[in-house]
């Protein structure tokens, strides 16, 4: 990918309040993530999410995060909220992801929780398998493995990411204003995803942290474009 024209996309995930969404939009977020997993502290009910999504301006994507949800549940959420992109973050198989996405006709990203023994070859195979299975596959989201679902708040070994898929991945896992510049400069991902790194409490965002995070990403973009 030509870094001279690349702008790292930014997703702020786990929003539950209108004021936090407006802060994220004002700071320049490209996508807003809503967690439809009832056991998450960042869970938002579909009717509440629908009210927030109705306030989104053009060209900002609403992403719905699901964990082991069945097709009927996803269909109901899509019908109620009009989310534009699905994010599968549980133990869904390749076939299940493809089938659910097809049932609602929405593109999807697949979260891969990277373990200490995950290899670069594993990541390449994941991408190949999902891309072969569905025309709606939009890319991998790489997060850190923890013994629970949803955001980890922890960083994994970025050196595992193969250079040839890095420009297509969404980088997640423990990102914050303190490491976002380094992450983008080293990995050059298509997008970054942050939740706990811009919070003052689970599900409650901090406007100063949002602004600092997005500024840190833009510092990296500017540095890459100057090379």
From Swiss-Prot:
It catalyses: N-(5-phospho-beta-D-ribosyl)anthranilate = 1-(2-carboxyphenylamino)-1-deoxy-D-ribulose 5-phosphate. Keywords: Amino-acid biosynthesis, Aromatic amino acid biosynthesis, Isomerase, Tryptophan biosynthesis. GO terms for biological process: L-tryptophan biosynthetic process. It holds the Pfam family PRAI. One of its GO terms (molecular function) is phosphoribosylanthranilate isomerase activity. Pathway: Amino-acid biosynthesis; L-tryptophan biosynthesis; L-tryptophan from chorismate: step 3/5. Its EC number is 5.3.1.24. SUPFAM superfamilies: Ribulose-phoshate binding barrel. It comes from the Bacteria. NCBIfam families: PRK01222.1-4 (NF002298), PRK01222.1-6 (NF002299). Belongs to the TrpF family. This is N-(5'-phosphoribosyl)anthranilate isomerase. The lineage of its organism: Bacteria, Pseudomonadati, Pseudomonadota, Betaproteobacteria, Burkholderiales.
